Amino acid sequence: MGFGNPYGDNYSEEIVFAWVNKLVSMGIQIISLADTVGVATAEQVYTMSKYLIDSLPSTEIGVHLHSRVDNWKKKLDAAVKAGCKRFDGALKGIGGCPMAKDELVGNMNTEWMINYFEENNFVTGINKEALEKSLQIAGEIFR
Protein backbone atom coordinates (compact mmCIF):
# COMPACT_ATOMS: atom_id res chain seq x y z
CA MET A 1 0.00 0.00 0.00
CA GLY A 2 1.91 2.94 -1.36
CA PHE A 3 0.01 5.71 0.38
CA GLY A 4 -0.72 4.37 3.86
CA ASN A 5 -2.88 1.75 5.49
CA PRO A 6 -5.73 1.51 7.98
CA TYR A 7 -3.97 -1.01 10.21
CA GLY A 8 -1.67 1.26 12.17
CA ASP A 9 1.37 -0.37 10.55
CA ASN A 10 4.50 1.73 10.19
CA TYR A 11 4.20 3.89 7.11
CA SER A 12 6.17 6.74 5.63
CA GLU A 13 7.07 7.92 2.17
CA GLU A 14 10.68 7.03 2.99
CA ILE A 15 9.69 3.38 3.54
CA VAL A 16 7.95 3.34 0.15
CA PHE A 17 10.95 4.99 -1.54
CA ALA A 18 13.35 2.48 0.06
CA TRP A 19 11.30 -0.48 -1.20
CA VAL A 20 10.94 1.01 -4.66
CA ASN A 21 14.71 1.50 -4.83
CA LYS A 22 15.26 -2.08 -3.67
CA LEU A 23 12.92 -3.39 -6.40
CA VAL A 24 14.62 -1.24 -9.04
CA SER A 25 18.04 -2.53 -7.92
CA MET A 26 16.70 -6.05 -8.58
CA GLY A 27 15.92 -5.13 -12.19
CA ILE A 28 12.23 -4.23 -11.88
CA GLN A 29 11.44 -1.61 -14.53
CA ILE A 30 7.75 -0.88 -13.91
CA ILE A 31 6.40 0.19 -10.50
CA SER A 32 2.77 1.03 -9.77
CA LEU A 33 2.03 2.79 -6.51
CA ALA A 34 -1.15 1.27 -5.11
CA ASP A 35 -3.79 3.13 -3.16
CA THR A 36 -5.40 -0.17 -2.23
CA VAL A 37 -7.71 1.15 0.48
CA GLY A 38 -8.35 4.58 -1.02
CA VAL A 39 -6.57 6.64 1.66
CA ALA A 40 -4.31 8.67 -0.65
CA THR A 41 -4.81 12.38 -1.03
CA ALA A 42 -4.28 14.07 -4.37
CA GLU A 43 -1.27 15.85 -2.85
CA GLN A 44 0.30 12.51 -1.85
CA VAL A 45 -0.33 11.05 -5.29
CA TYR A 46 1.40 14.04 -6.86
CA THR A 47 4.40 14.33 -4.54
CA MET A 48 5.23 10.63 -4.39
CA SER A 49 4.75 10.02 -8.10
CA LYS A 50 6.71 13.15 -9.04
CA TYR A 51 9.60 12.27 -6.73
CA LEU A 52 9.88 8.73 -8.12
CA ILE A 53 9.51 9.81 -11.75
CA ASP A 54 12.20 12.46 -11.32
CA SER A 55 14.60 10.29 -9.32
CA LEU A 56 14.18 7.10 -11.38
CA PRO A 57 14.00 8.23 -15.02
CA SER A 58 14.65 4.71 -16.38
CA THR A 59 11.76 3.24 -14.38
CA GLU A 60 8.14 3.49 -15.48
CA ILE A 61 6.13 4.77 -12.52
CA GLY A 62 2.38 4.32 -12.52
CA VAL A 63 -0.56 4.33 -10.15
CA HIS A 64 -3.28 1.90 -9.12
CA LEU A 65 -5.83 4.19 -7.50
CA HIS A 66 -8.92 3.42 -5.51
CA SER A 67 -11.34 6.28 -5.08
CA ARG A 68 -14.80 7.51 -4.34
CA VAL A 69 -17.03 9.35 -6.78
CA ASP A 70 -16.05 12.65 -5.16
CA ASN A 71 -12.25 12.30 -5.35
CA TRP A 72 -11.29 10.19 -8.37
CA LYS A 73 -10.64 13.14 -10.66
CA LYS A 74 -8.38 14.95 -8.18
CA LYS A 75 -6.27 11.82 -7.70
CA LEU A 76 -6.05 11.10 -11.43
CA ASP A 77 -5.23 14.72 -12.22
CA ALA A 78 -2.46 14.70 -9.59
CA ALA A 79 -0.88 11.60 -11.13
CA VAL A 80 -1.06 13.08 -14.64
CA LYS A 81 0.49 16.36 -13.49
CA ALA A 82 3.28 14.40 -11.78
CA GLY A 83 4.11 12.79 -15.12
CA CYS A 84 2.57 9.33 -14.75
CA LYS A 85 1.84 7.54 -17.99
CA ARG A 86 0.69 4.19 -16.57
CA PHE A 87 -2.72 3.88 -14.94
CA ASP A 88 -4.71 0.90 -13.69
CA GLY A 89 -8.48 0.96 -13.82
CA ALA A 90 -11.39 -1.46 -13.69
CA LEU A 91 -14.36 -1.69 -16.02
CA LYS A 92 -17.34 -0.07 -14.33
CA GLY A 93 -15.11 0.48 -11.27
CA ILE A 94 -15.87 -3.10 -10.27
CA GLY A 95 -13.90 -4.55 -7.43
CA GLY A 96 -12.22 -2.87 -4.58
CA CYS A 97 -10.72 -3.83 -1.30
CA PRO A 98 -12.71 -5.55 1.42
CA MET A 99 -10.24 -4.16 3.98
CA ALA A 100 -11.08 -0.55 3.07
CA LYS A 101 -12.90 1.13 5.92
CA ASP A 102 -14.97 3.18 3.46
CA GLU A 103 -17.51 0.99 1.65
CA LEU A 104 -17.76 3.58 -1.13
CA VAL A 105 -14.10 3.14 -2.11
CA GLY A 106 -13.50 1.04 -5.20
CA ASN A 107 -11.19 0.58 -8.13
CA MET A 108 -10.95 3.64 -10.31
CA ASN A 109 -13.47 3.39 -13.12
CA THR A 110 -11.78 2.84 -16.50
CA GLU A 111 -14.51 4.69 -18.39
CA TRP A 112 -14.07 7.80 -16.24
CA MET A 113 -10.33 7.63 -16.81
CA ILE A 114 -10.71 7.35 -20.59
CA ASN A 115 -13.13 10.29 -20.65
CA TYR A 116 -10.68 12.33 -18.56
CA PHE A 117 -7.79 11.52 -20.90
CA GLU A 118 -9.82 12.34 -24.01
CA GLU A 119 -11.13 15.61 -22.51
CA ASN A 120 -7.50 16.56 -21.87
CA ASN A 121 -6.41 15.60 -25.41
CA PHE A 122 -4.32 12.57 -24.48
CA VAL A 123 -4.06 9.88 -27.13
CA THR A 124 -5.17 6.66 -25.44
CA GLY A 125 -5.07 4.18 -28.30
CA ILE A 126 -8.19 2.60 -26.82
CA ASN A 127 -10.17 0.41 -29.20
CA LYS A 128 -13.65 1.83 -28.51
CA GLU A 129 -15.44 -1.10 -30.14
CA ALA A 130 -13.60 -3.60 -27.94
CA LEU A 131 -14.21 -1.42 -24.89
CA GLU A 132 -17.96 -1.33 -25.55
CA LYS A 133 -18.04 -5.10 -25.96
CA SER A 134 -16.07 -5.52 -22.72
CA LEU A 135 -18.47 -3.21 -20.89
CA GLN A 136 -21.42 -5.22 -22.19
CA ILE A 137 -19.85 -8.48 -21.01
CA ALA A 138 -18.97 -6.96 -17.63
CA GLY A 139 -22.57 -5.79 -17.29
CA GLU A 140 -23.79 -9.34 -17.87
CA ILE A 141 -21.31 -10.91 -15.47
CA PHE A 142 -21.57 -8.37 -12.65
CA ARG A 143 -25.31 -7.78 -12.34
Q: Where are the language model's segments positioned?
A:
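Catalytic cores and adjacent flexible loops of soluble metabolic enzymes
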Residues: 1-143
